C-alpha cells in the first residue's frame, strides 16, 4: 500500500502516526509539505523544531503534489489548509487515488459537487474525517435527513 500525505501539521502527523501504528512498515509513505518545515508535533502537542521528519516517520518527501500523485498512491490524506482541500482532493481523485479529507471539507461550497461527482465517476472512496460521527445529535440529524 502507498499513501500520500498532503500537509504535515499536527493533524497530518497524527494521521501518519495512526497509519504507521495500524499498518507498520508495510505502507510506503510519501509526503508533500509546501512550507518545507521540519517540525515534529508529538501526541501531546509538543513541537520539536529541526526534527528530521523522514527518519522520524519513515517517509519520503516529494517536491510537489504532482510528483506525489505521479507515484500512484492508493490513498491520499489531505491535511493542508481547508481552502485547499477540494482542489487537492480533485487532483488526487483524478490521479486514481482514494482520498481522506480532514474536516472541514472546505471553507466554501465551490466545487464540492464536482468533488462528489468525480469520486463517484472514478469509483473511488472519498472520506471526510469526523470525530462526531457516532454522537447522538449527529445520528438524529442523519435519521431526519
Predicted regions and their residues:
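N-terminal Rossmann-like dinucleotide-binding module
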Residues: 1-54
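A structural signal for short, well-ordered beta-strand elements
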Residues: 4, 61-62, 130
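Short hydrophobic "strand-cap" motifs at the C-terminus of beta-strands
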Residues: 6, 102, 129
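Short beta->alpha connector loops
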Residues: 9-11, 81-84, 106, 132-134
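Short, well-ordered alpha-helices that flank and scaffold nucleotide-derived cofactor binding pockets
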Residues: 13, 17-21, 90, 94, ...
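A short helix->loop->beta-strand "cap" motif at the edges of active sites that frequently abuts
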Residues: 26-27, 95-97, 122-125
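Beta-loop-alpha module in the N-terminal Rossmann-like domain of NAD(P)-dependent dehydrogenases
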Residues: 54-118
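A contiguous active-site-proximal alpha/beta segment in oxidoreductase catalytic domains
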Residues: 106-145
